[in-house]
Every structure is written in C-alpha cells, then in structure tokens.
Regions:
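Cap/insert and terminal regions of metallo-dependent hydrolase folds
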Residues: 74, 88-109, 217-305
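Core dinuclear metal-dependent hydrolase active-site scaffold
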Residues: 16-18, 49, 55-60, 66, ...
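Metallo-beta-lactamase
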Residues: 1-120, 149-208, 228-234, 254-273
Length: 305
C-alpha cells in the first residue's frame, strides 16, 4: 500500500527538523501504564526514567515556519515560583517531572542553531497545553497559535492546574490564539480518523484528534508526494514500540487513550513507512533522520551545566 498522499500535487513543505529545548525525567509508570492508579505510583515510586528530550518539530514551508509544540520554558528551572508549591497539587507537580534546561536551550536559540529566525514562525500548533509544550509562547507573540477548541475550553475550568494547565503561563497578553475543531472528513488517506483539520487547506499538514493524555490533544500528519509521511504525536505515546504493542501511557483518560492508540496503530499498519514522532521519544530524531526528509537535529541528551 502506498503512503497517504496529499490531495494536491504540490510541494509546500521544504524541510522538517527537530530541536530539543532541554530534557525531562519522568516516572517509568508515566511512560507505560502498569494498571496501578496514577496517584498511587506518583506518590510512592522512587524511580525516574533517564533524560528524555523535549522535542519541538520545525516544518519549513515555502511561506515560512510552522512549529509543532514549543518546548519547555527555562523559567521553570530558574524561577522557584513557576510551578504550584502548596498542597497536594504542589506535591504532584514536584513528583511528576524534573527538567534540565541550559541557557542556550530557549526556543529562539534552538531555532537559530539550525539556521532559522524565530521571526519566520507564522504558526505554532500545540498538541496540548502542558508546560513542556507551551514553553515558547512568550517568544511567539507574532505567530498564530493553533490548538483544539476542547483544550482551550479546559483552560477556562475552575482549577485548570489540576489538569496540568497553568493559566498564568498560557494566557499571556498579546498572543494570537486560534482554537480549531476537527470536522468530519472522508479522505481515505486519513482512515481510520473520521475528523480532521487541514491547517492550510492544501492537505500537507493535517491535525488529527488524539484525546486521552488531555481531552483536546492533537497530532499532526505531514504528507507530501514522494516523501515519507510523518505523524507528530505529542504525548499520545512516549515510545513508538510501546504504542505498537498496545501499551498505554500512565496518565490520562484510559478509554480515550486506548481509542487514540488503536487509531494511530491502524494508520501505521496501513502505511508502514509512516514515521511516528512523539514529543519525548529519544529515538524520534533518529527516526526522522532516517526518513526521506533527512533533517537537522539539535537535541541535547546530556544537559549542559
């Protein structure tokens, strides 16, 4: 079976790259669910994974740059008040993740390291609104910020921090938000997905709803005739091989995670050359490099000190 082809024989995408705005250690049960309630393992485990990248995917189009996610803000490791500190919520944040971000690992610096100017970013797609995906927002006041309407609605709930959304780091003045709602589609190249959002109307960048990690999580399919199709998966999985074997991440709504995992796995089975690129998979850079896109990777696995 051939790869999913964009409906128009055009070539709007010139290059795809990945940069890393630091690393994050998380709990092993976060990567792969053991079936134990999340609050239990989060409060009792002493184990951490090794450093995992905080990936930002960079799509160079004929008209400028598009980002998928924006990384982690360095203020999260320099400002003691960045995360909630009191009560159960503060304890959960302290036990959930630990970050390493060097001074040269801002979004602006990472883009410059591969020859790009952040001023050329005209659109940033956010897979969801957790801190390790929204860290570059303050550097992108000139760009359209695209996210699922459901994710945007979560920000207006009474206690979004309980869902991992820190309003004070998201709802910044001067940002150009563009919430979208995937609509029914009949494109056979997107099956089994029945709803999608074509970002520019040319079929090259298509947003797919993959709820579970958060209710409004999105993935993005990059497709162009003659090129390896790419699926930027956010936190739908932390390891492609675990997803292929049907294993779920440890945080999120399990039924929705399971449905999204099945949909992504079905898409992958139909198109074996599909390169799936999660946000924190250490092998994602190598997988992209091995694709027909090649790429320029600036990913730090050993944090600079």
């Amino acid at each position: 079976m051939t790869s999913p082809a964009a409906p128009h024989d055009r070539h709007p995408v010139r290059a795809v790259s990945v940069v890393s705005t630091g690393t994050v250690d998380i709990r092993p049960q976060h990567v792969r669910s053991t079936g134990t309630p999340a609050l239990w393992w989060l409060m009792t485990t002493r184990r951490w994974t090794g450093p995992r990248p905080i990936n930002v995917y960079v799509i160079e189009r004929n008209d400028g740059l598009v980002l998928f996610d924006t990384g982690q803000d360095r203020a999260s490791v320099t400002d003691p008040g960045y995360f909630p500190r009191s009560g159960l919520t503060g304890l959960i944040y302290r036990r959930l993740a630990r970050f390493e971000i060097a001074p040269d690992q801002t979004l602006t610096a990472r883009l410059a390291a591969i020859g790009y100017d952040i001023a050329d970013v005209h659109t940033a797609v956010l897979s969801h609104l957790h801190t390790d995906h929204i860290g570059g927002l303050a550097e992108l006041r000139h760009a359209d910020l695209v996210l699922h309407q459901r994710e945007w609605d979560t920000l207006s709930e009474p206690r979004p921090e309980a869902s991992g959304l820190l309003r004070e780091h998201i709802d910044l003045p001067g940002l150009r938000w563009r919430p979208v709602t995937p609509q029914p589609v009949t494109d056979p190249g997107l099956a089994p997905f029945t709803a999608a959002h074509d970002l520019f109307g040319d079929g090259s960048l298509v947003l797919l709803p993959t709820p579970g990690h958060t209710p409004g999580s999105l993935s993005m399919l990059v497709r162009q005739p003659g090129a390896t199709p790419l699926l930027m998966a956010g936190d739908a999985t932390f390891d492609v091989h675990l997803m292929q074997d049907g294993h779920l991440p440890g945080l999120g709504e399990r039924a929705a995670l399971r449905a999204s995992t099945r949909a992504l796995s079905t898409l992958w089975a139909r198109y074996p050359d599909l390169a799936i690129l999660p946000a924190h998979d250490p092998a994602a850079g190598m997988r992209l490099s091995a694709s027909s896109w090649g790429q320029r990777t600036v990913a730090v696995t050993e944090p600079q000190r």
